[in-house]
Amino acid sequence: MNFQVEPPEKKKTKNSSPPHSPPSSSSPSLSLLPEEIVVHCLARISRLYYPTLSLVSKSFRSILSSTELYATRSHLGSTEQCVYLCLWDPSYQFPQWLRLLVNPNRTLANSIIKKRRKKKKTTGQMLVPLTSSKFTSVSKATVVVGSEIYVLGGPVDSAVRVLDCCSHTWRDAPSMNVSRMNAWACFHDGKIYVMGGCQGLKDEPWAEVFNTKTQTWEGLPEPGSEVRKCSIDRSGVIEGKIEFGNVNEMCAYDTKLCKWEYCVNKSAALRSECMIENVSYGFWNMRLLWYDNDIQKDYWKRLEGLESLDDKYMRNGGSSGNTTKLVACGGKLLLLWEGYMKHNPNNRKKIWCAVIAIEKCDGGGVWGIVESVDVLYTVPISCQLLHCLVVSV
């Protein structure tokens, strides 16, 4: 998980030593090392320190923005999971993308906070807006591919925009064959599958697939009227099948057999479903549930230990009608929701975030431990939490 850590302040003493003189030209410097070694050194450092390191020199700035550095981070296994949010206010043309930083020093010690009421209470998380957000459109169809976020379509659009989460810059990818609005997308085995959103025209491919290696689009077989009419509010990849639908019906596309399936009276994957150590977690009916994929014919069970979170969720505007997102990051669950009350004179609402640690119990059970619950952002009541995505960089 990505963390923001501030170094402790050093206490000043009366007999403090005079400031050190600037290093001489003969002092050892990292910049004197071969660039390959510098890249390997920087690749082992958390990305949180990169903005400060970029001030050292132009050569450092060049290395910190290079693709070689992030390739080295991946090779060394030093990548970090980062959370990205997308907020949209209908009064603005473009959505706002933000990066979420989580503080590891925020613990369960609420009693310690109460004992130190004289000190200013600091939040465990913070959101950092990306300045390049205006280069993308509003779209439901977003997928994570490596260290990039693909935004597909928009208000009846075929364009595909890609956010490079290493440099926080946007680029264009090949456009879809069909303009789509409110489409759904999934990533599986190097390919992006896009479904729906094409205004129901039978002469247009209802679904198509994008090969991220060859950067080419290809239409999928005609799914039939039942699949076309299916109302989609969730999607996911299960055992090589692209599943989508709602609580009453489920459709699927078998990527190996290139075949469509339709099942009535069968629910699709839960909303905001994610996985930690082969245990699936989902949010449904204002409850966190879990499902062990290693147990055949297992069933969804309530995640225990979250009574305090349940109470805080309800007291701070959480409801079945509000947007709630659940993601897994760094072995923990992050639950985000829009919280606003009916009586709100300022027409504002808050974006909340709860960090939940997972503990496996004897006998195969799973327990949740609430580490922190914080307000991330205060936004106009018309603003919507569109996406919450986890990217490894």
Swiss-Prot record:
The keyword Methyltransferase does not apply. Pfam families: F-box, Kelch_FKB95. The keyword Repeat applies. Residues 1-30 are annotated as: Disordered. CDD domains: F-box_AtAFR-like. Residues 27-73 form the F-box domain. Kelch repeats lie at residues 148-190, 191-237, 239-272, 273-320. Keywords: Kelch repeat, Repeat. SUPFAM superfamilies: F-box domain (SSF81383), Kelch motif (SSF117281). Signal peptide: none annotated. InterPro entries: F-box-like_dom_sf, F-box/kelch-repeat_ARATH, F-box_dom, Kelch-typ_b-propeller, Kelch_1. This is F-box/kelch-repeat protein At4g19865.
